Swiss-Prot record:
Official protein name in the record: Urease accessory protein UreG
Protein purpose: Facilitates the functional incorporation of the urease nickel metallocenter. This process requires GTP hydrolysis, probably effectuated by UreG.
Molecular functions (GO terms): GTP binding; GTPase activity; nickel cation binding
Gene Ontology CC terms, in alphabetical order: cytoplasm
Binding site for GTP: G16, P17, V18, G19, S20, G21, K22, T23
Primary gene name: ureG
Keyword Transport: no
Family the entry assigns: Belongs to the SIMIBI class G3E GTPase family. UreG subfamily.
Keyword set, alphabetical order: Chaperone, Cytoplasm, GTP-binding, Nickel insertion, Nucleotide-binding
HAMAP family: UreG (MF_01389)
Naturally occurring in which organism (per UniProt): Shewanella halifaxensis (strain HAW-EB4)
Domain of life from the UniProt record: Bacteria
Main location: cytoplasm
Organism placement in taxonomy: Bacteria, Pseudomonadati, Pseudomonadota, Gammaproteobacteria, Alteromonadales
C-alpha cells in the first residue's frame, strides 16, 4: 500500500436523541473491538467537540483515532443533506490509519426523523432510551423504522419512569418487522454481545 492508498473502512452511523446514550455506547463498543479491529470515531456536536473529548478522556481510543466535527446550526444536515464535513473526517482518519476496519460516525443529538446519507454510512444504528417513555417506538420515524439496528437503551430506568418493556417490545416488532433491535443497559453490559455480533455479521468483518 503506497502513501496515497488506504483501505475503505466500514462506516457505521450512530444516531439518536440527545441523552439516549450514543457516546456511552461508542465507548463500550470501541473498548470491546479495538484489540480485534482497527477502529476510529467521528463525533458531531453543534458548537463544541465535547463528545470527542469524552471518548478521549475515557481512553476508548487513542486521541488520533477520534475527530470531532463542529457542525454549527442543524446537526441533521451534517449527516444527510450535506455530509461533506463528515466525509472529509472519515477520509482523514482513513489516510491517517491506512488499515482502518471501522469508522463510527456519531450524529449530533437529533430527532426521530433524522437519517444518515447512504454516502456517509454503510450501516446505521439508532439509539433510543426507555426514559423517553414507552411510546417512543410507536411514534415511528426513519430512525425507528429504517435503521439497520435499533437499540433501546437504559432498560434499568423502566420502573422509575413507568415504562413497560413488554409494550416497547411489542410496538418495536410492529414498527420494524424483520429488522433487528436490542434492549440494552450500558452500565451492566446487557445487550452488548448481541450488538457486537450484529456489527461483525452485518458489516461482514468476520469474513
Amino acid at each position: 500500500m503506497t502513501e496515497l492508498e488506504y483501505k475503505q473502512p466500514l462506516r457505521i452511523g450512530v444516531g439518536g436523541p440527545v441523552g439516549s446514550g450514543k457516546t456511552a455506547l461508542l465507548e463500550v463498543l470501541c473498548k470491546a473491538l479495538r484489540n480485534k479491529y482497527q477502529i476510529a470515531v467521528v463525533t458531531n456536536d453543534i458548537y463544541t467537540q465535547e463528545d470527542a473529548k469524552i471518548l478521549t478522556r475515557a481512553e476508548a481510543l487513542d486521541a488520533d483515532r477520534i475527530i470531532g466535527v463542529e457542525t454549527g446550526g442543524c446537526p441533521h444536515t451534517a449527516i444527510r443533506e450535506d455530509a461533506s464535513m463528515n466525509l472529509a473526517a472519515v477520509e482523514e482518519l482513513a489516510k491517517r490509519h491506512k488499515n482502518l476496519d471501522v469508522v463510527f460516525v456519531e450524529s449530533g443529538g437529533d430527532n426521530l426523523s433524522a437519517t444518515f446519507s447512504p454516502e456517509l454510512a454503510d450501516l446505521t444504528i439508532y439509539v433510543i432510551d426507555v426514559a423517553e417513555g414507552e411510546k417512543i417506538p410507536r411514534k415511528g420515524g426513519p430512525g425507528i423504522t429504517r435503521s439497520d439496528l435499533l437499540i433501546i437503551n437504559k432498560i434499568d430506568l423502566a420502573p422509575y419512569v413507568g415504562a413497560s418493556l413488554v409494550v416497547m417490545d411489542q410496538d418495536t416488532k410492529r414498527m420494524r418487522p424483520e429488522k433487528p433491535y436490542i434492549f440494552t443497559n450500558m452500565k451492566t453490559g446487557k445487550g452488548v454481545p448481541e450488538i457486537l455480533t450484529f456489527i461483525e455479521t452485518a458489516g461482514m468483518l468476520n469474513i
